[in-house]
Amino acid sequence: MNLTKMAVFAASLFCLACKNDIDTELEKKSIPESEIQKSEEKLPNEEELTPTDPDEETNKEETVTANATYDFTGNTPPPAPQGMKWVKISQLSDEFNNGFNTDKWTKSLWNYGVPVQMKAENSGVSDGKLWIKATLGNDPERWFETSRVMSKAQVNYPMYTVSRIKGAHISAYNTFWLNNGNISNRNEIDVIENNSNPSCNCQPDFPWQMNSQYFHVVNDDTKRNKGNFDNRELSDANPLKGVAWNEEYHTFGVWWKDATHIQFYLDGEPAGSVVSARDFTRELNIIWDLWTVDADWLGGLAKKEHLSNNNINTMKIDWIHTYQLVEE
């Protein structure tokens, strides 16, 4: 074995050891089943209760530029800072080609407000896709049957996660978010809360608007700001520019850079950002869910007749890739 091959072999062993160390630490941090439901709760009407603070800083350090090169598939993480590299976290990455991996994911079924009813059977994996389906139930109050999938492992900054998602075409939030805590004390990053088919006739931009934000709550004192981005503002070369959330799969990502800086991504491009008014202090779980409420800020209540249409009532997740930023 010559010196070059020996160097490459040694580097490979180092990378493998680094990856294994990250996954081992995540396994240690995975929360037990008994604590999952207690770890996250939020009101369904928080948008009304916690308006954006106009005084909070917005991070403008990353914007789409005409001469930049982007991977529109979303498969490539953002360029790592000098002296750093991205290492994939297997516990928080999945192609969903081998069924529902119960070592990585759990169905966390606490309810939002009416009409939502979380049910285990309304989510699963088939044909290489994780899916969450909204169906019509018989309960007169909780008739919107749906589900939620959450990671067992937790993660902290600096990290990047990206998921390829096609939204259900009903008036509901198709979500991809990170959270840890309860209504009174929590850290939360909402990568998307997307609704391609608002029923209220009051959210004309929603089919293309990426609703992204953070919540930082301490003893019921809420700090919040949004970094919403419209996919019609993607670069002209991006084939997904102006394509509604239900029409094609899009990739949605977030680079959680440090205790305050959060950069969102859409189809490989920077897509809005926020700077938290308080330091994030918690390790977060990754979550997908699908839910509705009778409120204009969500886009209006889902129509019952849409829940019986299997062509539009299902959110589909093709894959998720999550990375930790480490020193080279």
Curated annotation (Swiss-Prot):
Q: Which GO terms describe its biological process?
A: carbohydrate metabolic process
- GO MF annotation list: beta-agarase activity
Active site: residue positions: E188 (nucleophile), E193 (proton donor)
Alphabetical GO CC annotations of the entry are:
extracellular region
Q: Which reaction does it catalyse?
A: Hydrolysis of (1->4)-beta-D-galactosidic linkages in agarose, giving the tetramer as the predominant product
The reply to whether Hydrolase figures as a keyword in the UniProt entry is yes
Which EC number(s) are documented for this chain? 3.2.1.81
The entry's substrate-binding residues are 110, 119-129, 133-135, 188, 193, 224
* Region described as Disordered: 26-61
- Summarize induction of expression: When cells are grown with the low sulfated agar.
Which segments constitute the GH16 domain?
70-328
The principal location of this protein is secreted
The organism's place on the tree of life at top rank: Bacteria
Family affiliation? Belongs to the glycosyl hydrolase 16 family.
Report the protein name in the record: Beta-agarase C
Which organism's genome codes for this protein?
A: Zobellia galactanivorans (strain DSM 12802 / CCUG 47099 / CIP 106680 / NCIMB 13871 / Dsij)
